[in-house]
UniProtKB/Swiss-Prot annotation:
Protein role: Crystallins are the dominant structural components of the vertebrate eye lens.
Pfam families recorded: Crystall (PF00030)
Region (Connecting peptide): 113-118
UniProt note: domains: Has a two-domain beta-structure, folded into four very similar Greek key motifs.
PROSITE patterns reported for this sequence: CRYSTALLIN_BETA_GAMMA
GO biological process: lens development in camera-type eye; visual perception
InterPro entries (alphabetical): Beta/Gamma-Crystallin, Beta/gamma_crystallin, G_crystallin-like
Similarity-based family: Belongs to the beta/gamma-crystallin family.
Record keyword Repeat present: yes
GO MF term set: structural constituent of eye lens
Assembly description: Homo/heterodimer, or complexes of higher-order. The structure of beta-crystallin oligomers seems to be stabilized through interactions between the N-terminal arms.
Alphabetical UniProt keywords: Eye lens protein, Repeat
Name of this chain's protein: Beta-crystallin A4
Length: 210
């Protein structure tokens, strides 16, 4: 898709779109031991802390429906892990692509607006939606290979759907989940990407599967 980062975005296709949450239910089952062993608990809504259930951490899980984001610490803090439909028999199944694996997952919540078929994101060179910009509606394992200069993104506006940005190409490194129903889709600075964000470095981006 050569030239996809070179055009400007008109006001009618810009930041005025409303986010539509995907219809459906969310269900996740977690265990306190690897291999789906030990104590088990099922959720259909957010869990701010598995510690309150007597779990030290989640060590295996199955996502039965919907998309979820897991967090290293209670209260939706720390590293983020995208959890799409499927089985995760051990912690490295959800943290295998990160360069900074953490053997803890203690809170999680649904990604309500994930919509793989209708996802659109504008990336900006500088914070506060300044500088060069480009519009994305597909998965990009390397932004630089698609024409984006440098290895940083200053700010984002999520028009629709939910996205996961990664620090390095190939969806590696820290993950940052961006949703159209959080911050009104506006992420003006890396401080709004998550409590673990320390840099503007983003080199791959993909849509979250519902």
């Amino acid at each position: 898709m050569s030239g996809m980062f070179s055009g400007s975005i008109s006001e009618t296709s810009g930041m005025s779109l409303q986010c539509t949450k995907s219809a459906g239910h969310w269900k996740i089952v977690v265990w306190d031991e690897e291999g789906f062993q030990g104590r088990r608990h099922e959720f259909t809504a957010e869990c701010p802390s598995v510690l309150e259930l007597g779990f030290e951490t989640v060590r295996s899980l199955k996502v039965l429906s919907g998309a979820w984001v897991g967090f290293e610490h209670a209260g939706f803090q720390g590293q983020q892990y995208v959890l799409e439909r499927g089985e995760y028999p051990s912690w490295d199944a959800w943290s295998g692509n990160t360069s900074y694996p953490a053997e803890r997952l203690t809170s999680f919540r649904p990604v309500a607006c994930a919509n793989h078929r209708d996802s659109r994101l504008t990336i900006f060179e500088q914070e506060n939606f300044l500088g060069r910009k480009g519009e994305l509606s597909d998965d990009y394992p390397s932004l630089q290979a698609m024409g984006w200069d440098g290895n940083e993104v200053g700010s984002f506006h999520v028009h629709s759907g939910a996205w996961v940005c990664s620090q390095f190409p190939g969806y590696r490194g820290f993950q940052y989940v961006l949703e159209c129903d959080h911050h009104s889709g506006d992420y003006k600075h890396f401080r709004e990407w998550g409590s673990h964000a320390q840099t503007f470095q983003v080199q791959s981006i993909r849509r979250i599967q519902q």
